[in-house]
Amino acid sequence: MLKKTPLASGKKVKVTFELPANGAASVSVVGDFNGWDKDANPLKARKKDGVFSASINLPVGQVYQFRYWIDNQRWENDWAADDYVPNGFGEDNSVLHT
């Protein structure tokens, strides 16, 4: 799930990425906003409900592709993304519009 909160400057938006992943040991959000670096933006698990979450400030008016990397072995999309596009590997990437 994506939550977008405009920042006071009007030039950036705080994007909170959330993924229910009960039983997962690790989740990262990976996309063109971080060079597809699997280690750049790990999500933290909330103890009460098992949802993994992280926030990133991104420039307004941009379009980003991303996916979640779970337990260093599988990809998953955000099913509340703004859109989806084929990624060239026979799957789709999630799309975020800021």
Label the model's feature ranges.
Residues M1-K12:
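Extracellular ectodomain segments of secreted/surface proteins
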Residues K11-G61, D71-T98:
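Aromatic-rich carbohydrate-binding modules that target alpha-glucans
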